[in-house]
């Protein structure tokens, strides 16, 4: 059932409506576990759109297995998704820096407060993100160290390739994930793929993890997908490789593969002169290539 969480006219023109799709078993009303999937806070990140679609499709294909509530929020920033804009169009504001909001505040504070209020009561919330247009990332859970102990058991069930502790601003203060965790709703940030793009293989991998979590929580009684054991890293265990030259980077290895000491990772080339300006290799790689 599609429900409108909030609907408002924008001061600069246009209309903003945030909707959720609530899928629940028929005839069961009380004491149901609930999972919430949130996507589209940044309108240029489309990987979560596929995950929302595929989760809803699988649930509706076998409604007899559903024993809890699945809430799907495909577009928290619907205007941004319409225009493939990271920020809220016309306002040029990053929605993921406005939580938990204020019911008595300005327009965007009221919107974010309403979203938070609608998510309270969830047994788990998963906030879906993609990388930017320049980087493709393997499926990974990003955790703040403040909540890592409580969230790690859930994170291991997501079927992600990696769990990255304290990795990014997407889990820090004023974000949806940080606010919901402070309010007692376990919330994971899942990041994968690339901006302005959808990778079905990554999406299917994470949807399998979502159904594994739902099975463990008693929300889903159908076949339980198997999940892999993720690598777990902190900031100090992730190697960043930066070029010393300008130009175009051409990778020479596959995404998400192990590398050995001294392996050639890629080249920085000059398209004007037809020359290689720098060969990128790493003498001390300890993990897989996570991004490309």
Task: Give the predicted meaning of each segment.
Residues 1-292:
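Structured catalytic-domain cores with a bias toward divalent-metal coordination
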């Amino acid at each position: 059932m599609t429900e409108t969480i909030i609907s408002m006219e924008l001061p600069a023109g246009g209309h903003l409506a945030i909707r959720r799709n609530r899928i629940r078993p028929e005839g069961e009303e009380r004491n149901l576990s609930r999972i919430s999937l949130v996507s589209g806070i940044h309108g240029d990140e489309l990987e979560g759109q596929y995950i929302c679609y595929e989760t809803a499709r699988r649930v509706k294909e076998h409604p007899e297995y559903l024993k809890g509530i699945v809430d799907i929020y495909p577009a928290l920033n619907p205007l941004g998704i319409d225009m493939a804009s990271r920020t809220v169009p016309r306002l040029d504001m990053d929605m993921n820096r406005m939580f938990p909001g204020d019911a008595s505040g300005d327009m965007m504070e009221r919107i974010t407060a309403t979203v938070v209020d609608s998510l309270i009561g969830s047994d788990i919330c998963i906030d879906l993100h993609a990388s930017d247009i320049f980087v493709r990332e393997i499926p990974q859970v990003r955790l703040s160290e403040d909540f890592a102990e409580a969230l790690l058991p859930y994170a291991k069930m997501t079927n992600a390739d990696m769990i990255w502790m304290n990795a990014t601003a997407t889990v820090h203060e004023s974000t949806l994930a940080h606010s919901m965790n402070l309010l007692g709703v376990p919330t994971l940030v899942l990041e994968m793929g690339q901006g302005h793009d959808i990778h079905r293989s990554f999406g299917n991998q994470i949807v399998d993890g979502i159904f594994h979590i739902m099975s463990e929580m008693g929300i889903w009684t159908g076949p339980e997908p198997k999940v892999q054991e993720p690598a777990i890293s902190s900031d100090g265990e992730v190697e960043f490789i930066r070029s010393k030259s300008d130009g175009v980077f051409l990778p020479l290895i596959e995404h998400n593969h192990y590398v050995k000491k001294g392996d050639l990772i890629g080249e920085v080339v000059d398209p004007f002169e037809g020359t290689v300006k720098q060969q990128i290799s790493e003498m001390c790689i300890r993990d897989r290539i996570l991004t490309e």
